[in-house]
Amino acid sequence: MKKLLAIAAFSFSALFASAQNSEAYFLSQPCLTPDGQTVVFSFEGDLWKADVANGNATRLTAMQGYETNARVSPDGKWIAFSGRQYGNADVYIMPVAGGEIKQLTYHSAGDEVSSWGWDSKYIYFTSTRESRGSGYKVSINGGTPVRVFGNYFFQYDHNLFEHPSSGEIFFNDTWESSNQVQRKHYKGPFNPDIQSYNPATKKYKRYTDYIGKDFGATLDKKGNIFFISDEANNEYNLYTFDNGKKTPLTTFNSSIKNAIVNADGGKVVFEKDYQLYMYDVAAKKAEKLKINIIRNSILSKEKDFDVKGNITNFDVSPDGKKLAFTSRGEIFVSDVEGKFIEQIKKGSAERALEVKWLSDNKTILFNQTVGGFLNWFTIAADGTA
C-alpha cells in the first residue's frame, strides 16, 4: 500500500512539474530590471514577471483590456506600461513588486510607453493626440504631458530614449519603424535611421545612413547604444556601435523584435520566434529564456440554465419514455413527464442544432458545426461517451 501511494505521489508530482515547466510561447515586449535578473513581459493581455535564472513567471496585472510596453524605471522601483482598460491606450505605473496601479494619462488618443527618464521621475511615450504620432513625457505624479520636441520638429517621432548624460533624445520618425515595422527588406526614402536631438542645445545628430532599417535605439547608464537593423542578412538583428562603427551582435536567420537593454548594462532582452531571448554583452552570445507560466487556476462555476421558451428542436425516444431537445445550442434529456432534466455535455463549445434518438433508446444523434463544416455526431444519453 505504501509503495502504491509513493508511486501515485511521484506520478502526480511529475505531471505537475511537467505542466509547469513546459516552455511558453507568444511572449512579447519584454524589459529587464536594472540588474538584469528579472524580466517583465506581456502574455495573454497581462503583464508578467519572471526570474531570469529559473524562468518561473507570475502575473502582475489582470486589468480589462491589454497591458503592453512594460518598462522598468532606472531605479528599479516602478513599471510603466500602456493599458487599455477604457479602450484606448493610456500610461500607467505600478511597483515592480506588484501592488497599486496608478493611471497617468487620460486622453482619448493612444499613449504608448517608450522609456523612462534617467532620474526615474518621468516617462516618455508616443501619442496620436495632436498628430499621427509624437513624443511626449509625463511625470510619475501625473499632470499634463509635455511634447518633447515642441511643435516644429519631427512630426512622427517615436521610440524615444534619453541619453544618460548628453541630453540627447534618440528617436525614429518614419512609419517604417512604427506601424510598418513588420515590413522587412524595405529600402527607400522612408527608411528609419538611428538619430538624436538635444532639446537644450537644439543639435541634431544622425548615427546611421543605411538605406534599409535601423531603429529602436536603447541605452544603458553608460551610454552604450543597442538597436535593431536588417543590414547584414535582411533579417532584424541586434547591433551596437563599436568606437562609432555600426557592429552586428547577432546573426539570426529569423528576425528579432523589441530589444531593450537593462539600465545597469550588460544584458539585452528581445523577442524571437514568439519567445524571449537575452544577449549577454560580455559573453557575446544570446540564449533563449525558458519561461514557465504559473497560472492561478480557477474552477468552473455551475450556472442555472432556463430552457423555458428556448427549446428549438426535440425528439421522443422510441420507447416513449424520454425526451431529447436542444436549447441555446446545448443538448438536454428529460423524462416525458418533465420530472427531471439533465444537460448532456457534448465536449464542444459549438452549438447543437438538431437531435434524434437512435433505436437503442440509449444514443442520441445530433449535428453541429466543427471546423467550419456541419456534421453528425452521436453521444450517450447519460453523457458517459
Residue ranges and their predicted role:
Residues 31, 71, 115-117, 161, ...:
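Conserved beta-strand position repeated across blades of beta-propeller domains
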Residues 286-292:
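Short, solvent-exposed beta-strand-terminating loops
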